[in-house]
């Protein structure tokens, strides 16, 4: 490059020196065969050299920008779920549940963030990657006992019957009455925030059903969880275990079962 700059500087002041430098320039770039041709470096040659240099610089710049953008995207993805992961790592399931609700609002879009809650119609706009990231953290840090995909399997096993689902994950409790009655647990004190052998599968995370079950239905039906093994698991008798045990304890028949459908917490 220094040879090229020197040649450009003396182009007008010393023709003979320029001719000599041109030959050296050709030799350095094209080898001894080009030297015997004694072709002077033309303006077109300069243009070609500059163009090649410019193209190389542009390619490097584009590559650098692409790498920067990719790094920024990765960093953003890595940090949006950090708080949730921290709570789960430390087994702070109550805080993790609250953070999950906050994340669900955040990933549902700006309108949901301004509103402070999610419309069930907005769930379909959530990217599968975001829901899977949340779900994977719950599964990883609960030994596979918590998470949306765990809840989905239970929901499908009870043929999408939400009353049976709520009994199965113990979001409902058996009332001490003459007939078998279930009512929603009081939030937050009556829910189970510790992971042990007594904690039912799919108990967390909670999904507010104050405005009905459509939000939960849309979450469990999201394509993010479509690859789950929907056909594996317990038999129908095992799925009815919660109801059957309650019936046996109360000593009444199925025709006397009463479910209270207050799905709020």
Swiss-Prot record:
Keyword terms, alphabetized: Chlorophyll biosynthesis, Chloroplast, Membrane, Plastid, Transit peptide
Entry GO MF terms: enzyme binding; tetrapyrrole binding
Region spans: Disordered: 1-24
Protein's membrane topology: Peripheral membrane protein
Pfam families documented for this protein: GUN4
Superkingdom, taxonomy of origin: Eukaryota
Known outcome of mutating residue 88 to F: In gun4-1; decreases the protein stability
Summary of the function given for this chain in its UniProt record: Regulates chlorophyll synthesis and plastid-to-nucleus signal transduction by binding both the product and the substrate of Mg-chelatase, an enzyme that produces magnesium-protoporphyrin IX (Mg-Proto). Also activates Mg-chelatase. Neither binds abscisic acid (ABA) nor is involved in ABA signaling.
PANTHER family xref list: TETRAPYRROLE-BINDING PROTEIN, CHLOROPLASTIC
Assembly and oligomerization: Interacts with CHLH, the protoporphyrin IX-binding subunit of Mg-chelatase. Monomer or extremely compact dimer.
Name used for this protein in its record: Tetrapyrrole-binding protein, chloroplastic
Species: Arabidopsis thaliana
Lineage: Eukaryota, Viridiplantae, Streptophyta, Embryophyta, Tracheophyta
Gene responsible for this protein: GUN4
């Amino acid at each position: 490059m220094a040879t090229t700059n020197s040649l450009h500087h003396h182009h007008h002041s010393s023709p003979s020196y320029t001719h000599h430098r041109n030959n050296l320039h050709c030799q350095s770039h094209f080898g001894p065969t080009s030297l015997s041709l004694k072709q002077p470096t033309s303006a077109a040659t300069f243009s070609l050299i500059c163009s090649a240099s410019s193209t190389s610089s542009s390619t490097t710049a584009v590559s650098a920008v692409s790498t920067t953008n990719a790094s920024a995207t990765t960093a953003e993805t890595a940090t949006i779920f950090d708080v949730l992961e921290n709570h789960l790592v430390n087994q702070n399931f109550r805080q993790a549940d609250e953070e999950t609700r906050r994340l669900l609002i955040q990933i549902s879009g700006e309108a949901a963030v301004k509103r402070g809650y999610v419309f069930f119609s907005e769930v379909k706009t959530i990217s599968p990657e975001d829901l899977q990231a949340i779900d994977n953290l719950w599964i990883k840090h609960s030994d596979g006992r918590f998470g949306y995909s765990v809840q989905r399997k239970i929901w499908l096993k009870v043929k999408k019957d939400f009353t049976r689902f709520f009994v199965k994950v113990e979001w409902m409790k058996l009332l001490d009455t003459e007939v078998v009655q279930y009512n929603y647990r009081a939030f937050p004190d009556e829910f189970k925030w510790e992971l042990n052998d007594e904690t039912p599968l799919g108990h967390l995370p909670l999904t507010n059903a104050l405005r009905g079950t459509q939000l939960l239905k849309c979450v469990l039906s999201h394509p993010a969880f479509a690859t789950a093994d929907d056909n594996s698991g317990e038999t129908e008798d095992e799925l009815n275990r919660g109801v059957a045990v309650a019936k046996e304890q109360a000593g009444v028949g199925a025709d006397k079962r009463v479910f209270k459908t207050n799905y709020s917490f």
